[in-house]
Amino acid sequence: MTTLLRMQAVAVTRSARVVLNGATLALHAGERLAVHGGIGAGKSTLLLTALGLLEYQSGSIELLGHACRTEDDFAPLRGKVGLLFQDPDDQLIGPTVLEDVEFGPLNLGWDAHRAHHAADDALDQVGLPHLAQRPVHELSGGEKRLVALAGLLVMQPTVLLLDEPTVSLDIETTDRIFQILLASKLSMLIATHDPLCLDRLATRSVRLEHGIITD
């Protein structure tokens, strides 16, 4: 079984507070692993650390088969890992929906024609082709979450890291998010405190409490 992410005894301290205290987990290909715990348990820190966006003080991280400690280690791998932020406003940067979804491919050097068609396909995938020319600031919270997800899917990632993917969503949008994620068949690490994510999305779950992961 291929291991996509392995975190071994990872410790993270932020503002003199221990957030992760020897956290250990492994995400295997084909899994949708949920990390659940209360607000402030360190779930977001776990995801950011797994992608090298926060430094860790001790332990080890292996991402997509590569040992990762420094920015130089993580940077070449980020194009294969999609991170969905808890707040889509932290993720959306384009003036229009289509331009936002095109941004990632264009940033990787795709030609404009290829990026445009890939973005169209991603918007079809999340059910929002009719919003392609809509200014991002006019979207509802649920629409922003779906556009942010389209921006990840267009990059054809190997794995998704999802930070509270259903928080503050109505049941209709939550259902749509689940349908899209399940249809993608991607491996996922999901930080959540939503029981629906555990019941309907996760294939396995662990608990994060006081910086420690338990089964």
Map each language-model feature to its residues.
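The feature captures the beta-strand-to-loop junction immediately N-terminal to the Walker
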Residues: 36-38
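Helix-to-loop junction immediately C-terminal to a conserved catalytic motif
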Residues: 51
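Conserved ABC transporter NBD signature motif
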Residues: 56-70, 77
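Conserved ABC ATPase "signature" region
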Residues: 113-131
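Conserved ABC ATPase signature
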Residues: 135-139, 143
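Catalytic Walker B motif of ABC-type/P-loop ATPase nucleotide-binding domains
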Residues: 160-163
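H-loop/switch region of ABC-family ATPase nucleotide-binding domains
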Residues: 192-193
